[in-house]
């Protein structure tokens, strides 16, 4: 059997390539292309084509501010994008996207701040999360809650 298949170590380590942008510690992964296009126009941004996804960072910024990355479809591609932006410098990563709901009182367009996740997509089992539920960063959640409250936007919190 191939020794690489018997190891939990990565076979290929993502790294910064020639011409790749350096990113600051904060990044927003954006699932839907239309959302990425809208968010990237909120302020002047430089764009970097990565082949199957794009990266945006503030015009003229180097290693500071919020970067955007996307779009992507499915957990395997999301994992590849996340690994790449980590290699470029991202440390705190949030995801902006859509999801379905098993809660009958949630409606299309409701804002939900995830606290935990139920992972059933096939990629997460390859990450060492053990017996605990994957959970979000409480500090980042508080920042998001305050921002939404400041804007007067209603939201819910819960498991996704």
Where are these regions (language model features)?
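Generic non-transmembrane alpha-helical segments
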Residues: 143-151
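Metabolite-binding pocket within alpha/beta catalytic cores that recognizes anionic/polar moieties
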Residues: 1-143
């Amino acid at each position: 059997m191939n020794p690489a298949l018997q190891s939990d170590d990565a076979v290929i380590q993502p790294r910064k390539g020639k011409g790749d942008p350096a990113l600051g510690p904060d990044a927003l992964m954006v699932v839907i292309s239309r959302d990425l296009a809208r968010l990237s126009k909120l302020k002047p941004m430089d764009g970097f084509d990565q082949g199957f996804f794009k990266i945006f960072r503030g015009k003229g910024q180097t290693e500071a501010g919020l970067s955007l990355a996307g779009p992507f479809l499915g957990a395997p591609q999301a994992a590849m994008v996340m690994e790449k932006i980590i290699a470029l410098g991202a440390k705190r990563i949030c995801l902006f996207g859509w999801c379905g709901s098993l809660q009958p009182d949630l409606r299309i367009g409701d804002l939900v701040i995830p606290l935990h996740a139920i992972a059933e997509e096939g990629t997460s089992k390859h990450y060492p999360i053990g017996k605990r539920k994957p959970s979000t960063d409480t500090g980042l959640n508080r920042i998001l809650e305050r921002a939404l409250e400041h804007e007067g936007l209603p939201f819910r919190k819960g498991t996704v």
